């Protein structure tokens, strides 16, 4: 199953569960009892909302991102109001007929204060869900839930793999395109990497200009060679879309990357702006490894210590390049260039 589809189906299931539970809570507060109607209505509303949000409106995500966040919420709230009315009406009719009622009873229910209180309740709930999903996108996949659960409020030492991915000849590209078009190129590229990121279970730590930093817990990063496969998946997507980049920007961006692993201190810092940061020697070392890519004419350089942890299959080739002492470091480091055979 494709990683994006798998992620969407998981989200859809979560939305349906939350919606059903919300229906039960509403009925408990309103009627002091529970029956299947609250679950049935909540499940169908959640399913409709999830399909609309994840499979229909998601196709227009880039257009929505151009809107101010407020108008993004307003437009979607209007759409959800329409969908809720379309879905809730037939369900109320079905329940009315099932319980021996008739059309007149349906119309009475449809224009009753109780029906509209359900609509308002559902609209508020789904607007909050959209708000959460959009904020989650803004701060980074999975980061918001870590804040909500208080993870990393106290510093934690953990072992992680890092990849520093950087555009080659970025200064030349920026001068050629101009600042506006250059950042449009970067934004388009950062959208391109979504599928490789999900497929290889990477976390996007930060964007720094034309550089993006990926991270994994070591166990996740080395499993199925995620920490190197992501690079080749990204390059493959660029190759598949090279004609589009040529037509739009007159070039196809090229990237280089350095990968290393080690211990870091992970913690939440800040007051007015709170972020989760990683602090450790591995960060500087990985950045230095990436800087050697141009010198050794290699697109993907990894440390010898990381290579020892990886079980490369016949798909990949790792060639020893050199033993170096990165700038500002006392210990030497073996560098290996990784290529993909096919």
Task: Identify the meaning behind each predicted range.
Residues 15-19, 37-58:
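Generic alpha-helical transmembrane segments
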Residues 155-229:
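Catalytic NTP-binding/metal-coordinating core of nucleotidyl cyclase/transferase enzymes
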Residues 200-226, 242-281:
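Catalytic core of nucleotidyl cyclases, primarily class III adenylyl/guanylyl cyclases
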Residues 295-342:
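Cytosolic regulatory/linker segments at or just downstream of nucleotide-handling modules
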């Amino acid at each position: 199953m494709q990683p994006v589809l798998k992620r969407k189906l998981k989200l859809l299931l979560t939305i349906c569960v939350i919606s059903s539970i919300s229906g039960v809570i509403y009925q408990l507060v309103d009627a002091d009892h529970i029956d299947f109607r609250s679950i049935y209505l909540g499940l169908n509303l959640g399913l409709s909302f999830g399909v609309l949000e994840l499979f229909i409106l998601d196709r227009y995500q880039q257009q929505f991102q151009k809107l101010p966040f407020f108008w993004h919420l307003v437009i979607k709230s209007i759409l959800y109001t329409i969908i809720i009315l379309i879905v809730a009406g037939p369900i109320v009719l079905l329940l009315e007929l099932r319980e021996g009622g008739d059309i007149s009873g349906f119309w009475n229910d449809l224009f009753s204060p109780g029906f509209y209180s359900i609509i308002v309740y559902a609209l508020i709930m789904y607007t909050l869900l959209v708000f959460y999903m959009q904020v989650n996108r803004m701060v980074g996949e999975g980061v918001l839930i870590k804040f909500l659960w208080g993870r990393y409020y106290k510093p934690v030492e953990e072992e992680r793999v890092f990849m520093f991915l950087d555009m080659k000849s970025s200064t030349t590209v920026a001068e050629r395109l101009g600042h506006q078009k250059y950042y449009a190129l970067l934004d388009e590229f950062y959208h391109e990497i979504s599928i490789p990121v999900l497929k290889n279970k990477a976390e996007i730590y930060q964007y720094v200009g034309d550089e993006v930093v990926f991270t994994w817990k070591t166990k996740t990063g080395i499993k199925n060679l995620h920490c190197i496969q992501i690079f080749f998946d990204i390059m493959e997507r660029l190759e598949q879309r090279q004609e589009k980049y040529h037509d739009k920007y007159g070039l196809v961006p090229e990237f280089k990357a350095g990968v290393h692993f080690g211990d870091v201190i992970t913690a939440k810092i800040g007051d007015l702006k709170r972020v989760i940061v990683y602090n450790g020697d591995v960060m500087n070392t990985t950045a230095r490894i990436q800087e050697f890519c141009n010198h050794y004419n290699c697109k993907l350089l990894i440390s010898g210590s990381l290579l020892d942890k990886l079980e490369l299959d016949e798909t990949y080739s790792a060639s020893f390049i050199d033993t170096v002492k990165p700038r500002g470091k006392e210990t030497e480091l073996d560098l290996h260039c990784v290529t993909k055979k096919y």
